[in-house]
UniProtKB/Swiss-Prot annotation:
UniProt crosslink position (Glycyl lysine isopeptide (Lys-Gly) (interchain with G-Cter in SUMO)): 363, 376
Biased composition (Basic and acidic residues): 25-34
Main location: nucleus
Keyword vocabulary terms for this entry: Activator, Coiled coil, Cytoplasm, Developmental protein, Differentiation, DNA-binding, Isopeptide bond, Nucleus, Phosphoprotein, Repressor, Transcription, Transcription regulation, Ubl conjugation
PTM characteristics: Sumoylation inhibits the transcriptional activity.
Comp. bias regions, Acidic residues: 755-768
Keyword Phosphoprotein recorded: yes
GO BP annotation list: brain development; cartilage condensation; cartilage development; cell fate commitment; chondrocyte differentiation; positive regulation of chondrocyte differentiation; spinal cord oligodendrocyte cell differentiation
UniProt xrefs under InterPro entries: HMG_box_dom, HMG_box_dom_sf, SOX/SOX-like_TF
Origin organism lineage: Eukaryota, Metazoa, Chordata, Craniata, Vertebrata
Coiled-coil annotated residue ranges, if any: 184-262
The protein's name: Transcription factor SOX-6
Subunit structure as annotated in this protein's UniProt entry: Homodimer. Interacts with DAZAP2. May interact with CENPK.
Length: 787
């Protein structure tokens, strides 16, 4: 080492100095105005003798003062470039085999210092070289320090990096929070939408709350109204109960009066259950609908007889209807009649010799004891047949009638009262306005006594009498009208009490003459029950003739016979033309057996209700179920067409009814009667009525309760006609139609079933059914009924 120092150290130094000089000159030209050299020149004397431990903090402080990250990087790059230049300057040192030593370094520094201070130019270049050398050393030391303690630089860099990253993150976050104008507008729109929805929700809640309040208030109001209504109903019920008690008290008083006035003769009025819809009691009473002695009668006058107070009070108290009150009145009058004929029921009354007798009266007297007189009471057991016109006048019952044993032989019995009657029976009703009621023929013997055999026997006898009458009429054809008036004697002509009454009866002949037909039949109001087709009508009432379906009329002044009766015109064919029944349709074929089944299960069911049941069943049936009946209909139609090739159906027009001057159809009339009955029921007691047993002269008791509404009766009825199947009303209308009565062909009164007999008749005569196109031509219309 010493040898090296001894051997030409300056030569090397000179060579190196020349190289350094050239290098510095070129560097000065390149960098020109580099400020780093000038800035570091004053530090050289101080830093030259300082140890490395003092130089590192100085460098660190210098680096820390640089706040900009880019300036730090640029300075590092410049230091690296200077380091490269210095490496070329001191490359000779790296060629030595010995490591660089500190003493050698110091010696070199001394040499360089001495050389540098030689001239100003060299001094300037030496200072720059020294600075570069120091920088290189510092970089080497920093590299070693970083390797020894890497956290130092990481701390330095991480602090600045973290600050920058924090600044970047904060700005981004602020940008996201602040947002763009579009996002802000969208958010504002969403907020406004939410506010609007909240406002609408609030309004809905308020409205629902108000509705709940209103609903609660309305419910409270309804409850209050219901409570008020219930209270009013209770008060009304209490008033009605009070009225019922008062009426019951009045009834009790009337019953006491009846008991006090017990000297009145008993009434022979059979009482029947109201649901049978019969007027048998009415017929029995009306046979005694007579006038007291001394009271004359003119056809245009009303009955001048007033009710007997005690009897009528008893009837009103017992719940009788207006018709039944009229019947009671008739029976009471009959019981008060006193005549010689009443005491001799088995012998004919002698002719009245007072006054002159017309030839008609003489002929009638000659036939006074004819067997024809037996017909009346037997035919009276049959219902009226309104669909046909009689061929003969209807005689009344004679005292010698074989059916007289059907009734008790009592002095006050209404059946025996025709013997003492001075008023004509239904035949007179067809001859003059002042006739008695034609309900005389509606007496229902089976309903009275339940003896159907007796009724059938009477029917057969009536047929025989009818044949005998026809034979006698054929013998008396030259006498004309005299033959038609053969039964006048039986109407009480010989029982007239004075000549004035006889004269009135004789004057009935011209009236009959004006209304008689050429074929020996009377006017349209006369019905002959002695004909087989008329008598067979009794079988139409469910086999027992328990339900009468005929019309009756009250005799009033100013009403003619034609107005007070049902009459029909011919349907385009002569009276002698035979009636051809229509073939049954499918419904009739099916209903034939079904109706029988229903009647077997419910014998008392009304025909209209049965028809409704059958109609609803038929509509509910399927076409497959109806097919066999349609086939049967086709077969029957084919047979009918072969039998009657020229048959043409001629329907009769609908019946009409005149009420208070208005022309009503039957359905309208029924509705009117219903409303009138309903109005009447509102004024009278409704409920259980006391039973009044009626005892006849022979001790026969007819128990039963009269449950019909009571009313104040009047003997003068203001209208002309009604139906026995409906409850009687004070105003009884006129039944009128535009077709005549049939002359032949058996028909059924009403539309009732025949208990297995003559179903074909029943179905042909079925008028009320919707399938009425297949009903019979000679059917009897269903009686006017509100039931």
């Amino acid at each position: 080492m010493s040898s090296k120092q001894a051997t030409s150290p300056f030569a090397c130094a000179a060579d190196g100095e020349d190289a350094m000089t050239q290098d510095l000159t070129s560097r000065e030209k390149e960098e020109g105005s580099d400020q780093h050299v000038a800035s570091h020149l004053p530090l050289h004397p101080i830093m030259h003798n300082k140890p490395h431990s003092e130089e590192l903090p100085t460098l660190v402080n210098t680096i820390q003062q640089d706040a900009d990250w880019d300036s730090v990087l640029s300075s590092q790059q410049r230091m690296e470039s200077e380091n490269n230049k210095l490496c070329s300057l001191y490359s000779f040192r790296n060629t030595s085999t010995s490591p660089h030593k500190p003493d050698e370094g110091s010696r070199d520094r001394e040499i360089m210092t001495s050389v540098t201070f030689g001239t100003p130019e060299r001094r300037k270049g030496s200072l720059a070289d020294v600075v570069d050398t120091l920088k290189q050393k510092k970089l080497e030391e920093m590299t070693r320090t970083e390797q020894e303690d890497p956290s130092c630089m990481e701390k330095l860099l991480s602090k600045d990096w973290k600050e920058k990253m924090e600044r970047l993150n904060t700005s981004e976050l602020l940008g996201e929070i602040k947002g763009t104008p579009e996002s802000l507008a969208e958010k504002e729109r969403q907020l406004s939408t939410m506010i609007t929805q909240l406002i609408s929700l609030r309004e809905q809640l308020l409205a629902a709350h108000d509705e709940q309040k209103k609903l609660a208030a309305s419910q409270i109001e309804k409850q209050r109204q219901q409570m008020d209504l219930a209270r009013q109903q209770q008060e009304q019920i209490a008033r009605q109960q009070q009225q019922l008690l008062q009426q019951q008290h009045k009834i009790n008083l009337l019953q006491q009066q009846i008991q006090v006035q017990g000297h009145m003769p008993p009434l022979m009025i059979p009482i029947f259950p109201h649901d049978q819809r019969t007027l048998a009691a009415a017929a029995a009473a009306q046979q005694g609908f007579l006038f007291p002695p001394g009271i004359t009668y003119k056809p245009g006058d009303n009955y001048p007889v007033q009710f007997i107070p005690s009897t009528m009070a008893a009837a009103a108290a017992s719940g009788l209807s207006p018709l039944q009150l009229q019947q009671l009145y008739a029976a009471q009058l009959a019981s008060m009649q006193v005549s010689p004929g009443a005491k001799m029921p088995s012998t004919p009354q002698p002719p009245n010799t007072a006054g002159t007798v017309s030839p008609t009266g003489i002929k009638n007297e000659k036939r006074g004891t004819s067997p024809v007189t037996q017909v009346k009471d037997e035919a009276a057991a049959q219902p009226l047949n309104l669909s046909s016109r009689p061929k003969t006048a209807e005689p009344v019952k004679s005292p010698t009638s074989p059916t007289q044993n059907l009734f008790p032989a009592s002095k006050t019995s209404p059946v025996n009262l025709p013997n003492k009657s001075s008023i004509p029976s239904p035949i007179g009703g067809s001859l003059g306005r002042g006739s008695s009621l034609d309900i005389l023929s509606s007496l229902n013997s089976p309903a009275l006594f339940g003896d159907q055999d007796t009724v059938m026997k009477a029917i057969q006898e009536a047929r025989k009498m009818r044949e005998q009458i026809q034979r006698e009429q054929q013998q008396q054809q030259p006498h004309g009208v005299d033959g038609k008036l053969s039964s006048i004697n039986n109407m009480g002509l010989n029982n007239c009490r004075n000549e004035k009454e006889r004269t009135r009866f004789e004057n009935l002949g011209p009236q009959l003459t004006g209304k008689s037909n050429e074929d020996g039949k009377l006017g349209p109001g006369v019905i002959d029950l002695t004909r087989p087709e008329d008598a067979e009508g009794s079988k139409a009432m469910n086999g027992s003739a328990a339900k009468l379906q005929q019309y009756y009329c009250w005799p009033t002044g100013g009403a003619t016979v034609a107005e007070a009766r049902v009459y029909r015109d011919a349907r385009g064919r002569a009276s002698s033309e035979p009636h051809i029944k229509r073939p049954m349709n499918a419904f009739m074929v099916w209903a034939k057996d079904e109706r029988r089944k229903i009647l077997q299960a419910f014998p008392d069911m009304h025909n209209s209700n049965i028809s409704k049941i059958l109609g609803s069943r038929w509509k509910s049936m399927s076409n497959q179920e109806k097919q066999p009946y349609y086939e049967e209909q086709a077969r029957l139609s084919k047979i009918h067409l072969e039998k009657y090739p020229n048959y043409k159906y001629k329907p009769r027009p609908k019946r009409t009814c005149i009420v208070d001057g208005k022309k009503l159809r039957i359905g309208e009339y029924k509705q009117l009667m219903r409303s009138r009955r309903q109005e009447m029921r509102q004024f009278f007691t409704v409920g259980q009525q006391p039973q009044i047993p009626i005892t006849t002269g022979t001790g026969v008791v007819y128990p039963g309760a009269i449950t019909m509404a009571t009313t104040t009766p009047s003997p003068q009825m203001t209208s002309d006609c009604s139906s026995t199947s409906a409850s009687p009303e004070p105003s009884l209308p006129v039944i009128q139609s535009t077709y005549g009565m049939k002359t032949d062909g058996g028909s059924l009164a009403g539309n009732e079933m025949i208990n297995g007999e003559d179903e074909m008749e029943m179905y042909d005569d079925y008028e009320d059914d919707p399938k009425s196109d297949y009903s019979s031509e000679n059917e009897a219309p269903e009686a006017v009924s509100a039931n």
